[in-house]
């Protein structure tokens, strides 16, 4: 009898998307194929504490519970909470946002010489930064919304013209979105149409990041697709997000029970548009050197039916309402099989990396 693969399921973290991470981890924990895998949950609290095995399992059933006798992850001598886990064969990180999907955690796995689900270090860092994603997408021939990046030193300079709404509006139009460059789940995002709103939006976005993007508003419908694989990735169908009039897909609309947004899977769109969304997604996935998985978000612009890239989510949610697993379920890959494939792709990439030379003989 073959031994089961030991999976380290890492979730939580010091992130604005902490609750989403716990919901995702709960679903993975419940749906993973227990005939193939033994799961060892590793909970990092929102304060950055590492929980033991027993508490990590409890929080998956009760997300509001607080860890007993916590140990700060930052203090290496206190990572004793890992002693009650066996040697892990593969890590499945589902830590959203900063430190979880920006290359930091992925770098740790590389140092530990362990396979892990999702992007490698470079792709994780690139796709977390919305501006870098835009630059690479443009080079790949994928349309993106016009933007201006405002960095912290510019924000601290009262004479910088990027702080002047009239100047920015002359470049991008008067209808704008302001967002942190390195955040997800619409955290810190504001829609602005005047000077007062612009100043408030900048202040809000700079709470979350040291670089903020100001983008033209692309009027249309939000469309998403999902990509799975390494060198020969497959692209799922397309889903559409139907928002209430004058609203957009906010954090609350994504996860609140009273959401005013609905998901349409598959999207009721002409086949030509569906294929364009899928082709653009593949281009972006490859241009950013993603591997394993990614959800590619775009806007279908009303005026000309152009598909305009919004962002790449290289560690998408796995909650009950998350688009990524739903899109693959719609094309015949159920949740449990999807988890298995993601772990298989992680092992495949790791095995390939081991064949590369790292020193000159």
Swiss-Prot record:
Keywords: ATP-binding, Cell shape, Cell wall biogenesis/degradation, Cytoplasm, Ligase, Magnesium, Manganese, Metal-binding, Nucleotide-binding, Peptidoglycan synthesis. Its EC number is 6.3.2.4. It is an enzyme of class 6 (ligase). Residues 134-344 form the ATP-grasp domain. Mg(2+) 2 binds at residues 311, 313. One of its GO terms (molecular function) is D-alanine-D-alanine ligase activity. Binds 2 magnesium or manganese ions per subunit. Its main location: cytoplasm. InterPro entries: ATP-grasp, ATP_grasp_subdomain_1, D-Ala_lig_Van_CS, D_ala_D_ala, Dala_Dala_lig_C, Dala_Dala_lig_N, PreATP-grasp_dom_sf. Its cofactor is Mg(2+); Mn(2+). Pathway: Cell wall biogenesis; peptidoglycan biosynthesis. The keyword Phosphoprotein does not apply. Cell wall formation. PANTHER family: D-ALANINE--D-ALANINE LIGASE, D-ALANINE--D-ALANINE LIGASE A. This is D-alanine--D-alanine ligase. It comes from Lactobacillus gasseri (strain ATCC 33323 / DSM 20243 / BCRC 14619 / CIP 102991 / JCM 1131 / KCTC 3163 / NCIMB 11718 / NCTC 13722 / AM63).
């Amino acid at each position: 009898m073959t031994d089961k693969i030991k999976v380290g399921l890492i979730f939580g973290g010091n992130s604005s998307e902490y609750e989403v991470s716990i919901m995702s981890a709960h679903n993975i924990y419940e749906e993973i194929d227990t005939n193939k895998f033994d799961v060892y949950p590793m909970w990092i609290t929102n304060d950055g504490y590492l929980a033991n095995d027993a508490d990590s399992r409890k929080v998956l059933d009760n997300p509001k519970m607080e860890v007993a006798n916590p140990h700060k992850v930052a203090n290496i001598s206190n990572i004793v909470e890992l002693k009650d886990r066996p040697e892990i064969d593969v890590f499945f990180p589902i830590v959203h946002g900063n430190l979880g999907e920006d290359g930091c955690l992925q770098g740790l796995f590389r140092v530990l010489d362990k396979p892990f689900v999702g992007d490698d270090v470079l792709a994780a860092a690139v796709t977390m930064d919305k501006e870098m994603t835009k630059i690479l997408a443009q080079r790949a021939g994928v349309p993106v919304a016009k933007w201006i990046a405002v960095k912290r030193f510019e924000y601290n300079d009262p004479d910088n013209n990027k702080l002047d709404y009239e100047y920015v509006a002359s470049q991008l139009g008067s209808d704008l979105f302001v967002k942190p460059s390195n955040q997800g789940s619409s955290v810190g995002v504001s829609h602005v149409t005047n000077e007062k709103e612009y100043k408030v939006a900048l202040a809000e976005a700079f709470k979350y990041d040291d670089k903020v993007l100001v983008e033209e508003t692309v009027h249309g419908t939000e469309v998403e697709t999902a990509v799975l694989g390494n060198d020969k990735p497959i692209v799922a169908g397309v889903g559409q997000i139907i928002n209430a009039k004058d609203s957009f897909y906010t954090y609350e609309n994504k996860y609140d029970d009273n959401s005013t947004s609905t998901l349409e899977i598959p999207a009721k769109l002409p086949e030509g548009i569906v294929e364009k969304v899928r082709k653009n997604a593949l281009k972006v996935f490859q241009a950013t050197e993603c591997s394993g998985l990614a959800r590619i978000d775009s806007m279908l612009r009303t005026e000309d039916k152009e598909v305009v890239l919004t962002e790449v989510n290289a560690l998408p949610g796995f909650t009950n309402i998350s688009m990524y697993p739903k899109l693959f379920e719609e094309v015949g890959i159920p949740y449990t099989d999807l988890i298995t494939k993601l772990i298989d792709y992680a092992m495949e990439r790791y095995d390939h990396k081991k064949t590369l030379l790292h020193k000159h003989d």
